[in-house]
């Protein structure tokens, strides 16, 4: 899976640019790290890539995943997530139970909820992790 950023930049609603445009290609199998002091825009950049910015911000440039432009796709269709530095899980719950918190409230019924969780685990190649 490759990720490419082409002149990606973020501005505020008052037209203040938060960082210089970013151009980078991260090829399949490569790992990249965003580093810098507090307040320089690391989280904002990652949120722009994932499509999680509020309407108070404007994004210009392009985000490509596997060569496909995803810049204007809804968050769910981008298939891009953020791994936070600190765990955001409930340590007393299983992997499956933690994932249940992320399900839409429209998924009603234990069997349907379990099926969606198992499908997500399978997509992540973690199908044996439900009860861990």
Predicted region positions:
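Helix-to-loop junction immediately C-terminal to a conserved catalytic motif
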Residues: 50
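ABC ATPase NBD coupling module
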Residues: 54, 68-84, 110
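Conserved ABC ATPase "signature" region
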Residues: 69, 111-130
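Short coil-to-helix segment of the ABC ATPase nucleotide-binding domain corresponding to the Q-loop/switch region
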Residues: 93-102
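A short, flexible loop at the N-terminus of ABC-type nucleotide-binding domains that lies
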Residues: 1-21, 53-56, 72-74, 107
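Conserved hydrophobic segment flanking the Walker A/P-loop of ABC-type ATPase nucleotide-binding domains
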Residues: 26-28
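Conserved ABC transporter NBD signature motif
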Residues: 58-68
């Amino acid at each position: 899976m490759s990720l490419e950023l082409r002149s990606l930049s973020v501005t505020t609603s008052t037209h203040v640019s938060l960082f210089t445009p970013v151009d980078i290609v991260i090829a399949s199998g490569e790992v990249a790290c965003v580093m810098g002091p507090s307040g320089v825009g690391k989280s904002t950049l990652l949120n722009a890539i994932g499509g999680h910015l509020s309407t108070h911000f404007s994004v210009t440039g392009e985000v490509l995943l596997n060569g496909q432009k995803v810049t204007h796709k809804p968050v769910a269709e981008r298939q891009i997530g953020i791994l936070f530095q600190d765990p955001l899980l409930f340590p007393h719950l299983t992997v499956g139970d933690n994932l249940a918190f992320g399900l839409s409230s429209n998924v009603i019924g234990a069997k349907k909820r379990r099926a969606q969780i198992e499908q997500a685990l399978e997509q992540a190649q973690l199908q044996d992790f439900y009860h861990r």
